[in-house]
Amino acid sequence: DLSDTRDASFSPDGRTIAFSSGNNLYLYDIVGDSVRPITTDGAWNRIINGTTDWVYEEECAFTKAYAFSPDGQKIAYLRFDESRVPVFEMMRYDGKLYNEAYSFKYPKAGDANSVVDLYVYDLKTGETERVDVGPDRGQYILQPEWTPDGRLCFQRMNRRQNHFEAVLCNP
């Protein structure tokens, strides 16, 4: 079921569309009219691939958490492990006779945030490689992008948000 599709983006050559759905990242081949998953471990309130969790969406101001390389052969993407983040529950008031509770991961001050990893997926080989983002598992990993010459750039910032680095690497 791909009904909750979001954050769609064309590849540089315009032949492929990447998108997130069901907490997984997918590729749609326009010419072949076929969809293939890049990730399969996405699960509600546990793992998010290719799009951000609540903290990143609200506090870091972005949702699309992947980027095509300039040659369109690779995709860098963020993977959010929310398993340690506490669940927050609120009532949905949507006009029904009985309201339903909506549960989602929502860290309050001092609670655990998602553990974020950066991966690079090779469209030709289908292989995925984890990028070393440093030893601080509680840091923010922001805005994965590619330079015109094919190097991967991302930003990292500690949770106190008083130390920021731009990192350039060759995955």
Regions found by a protein language model. Give the residues of each.
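Hydrophobic beta-strand positions that form the internal "hydrophobic ladder"
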Residues: 14-18, 72-75, 150-154
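Short loop/turn segments that connect beta-strands within beta-propeller blades
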Residues: 30-33, 122-126, 170-171
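Long hydrophobic segments that form regular secondary structure
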Residues: 122-158
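Predominantly five- to eight-bladed beta-propeller fold
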Residues: 38-66, 77-130
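Beta-rich catalytic cores
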Residues: 4-6, 62-64, 114, 140-142, ...
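Structural WD40 beta-propeller signal
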Residues: 11-13, 69, 147
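Structural motif
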Residues: 22-28, 84-91, 115-117, 161-168
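Asp-box/WD-like beta-propeller blade repeats and closely related beta-sheet repeat scaffolds
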Residues: 1-65
